[in-house]
Amino acid sequence: MIVYSVFIFAVLAISSVTGIFLPGGGGKKCGGHGEYGSGVIIGAERPKK
């Protein structure tokens, strides 16, 4: 379980960092729109649509 949480943390960190470098402020869209960064991963594991 600890490994899973660490993996999620790493994924969110990497996706948020990549979102910053994406055009259009991808970091702000994380976790909701599923377009940039962690939004894609979170949307895949826990779809809230």
Swiss-Prot record:
InterPro entries: Celegans_Fungus-Induced_Rsp (IPR052889), Fungus-induced (IPR024415). It holds the Pfam family Fungus-induced. This is Fungus-induced-related protein 16.
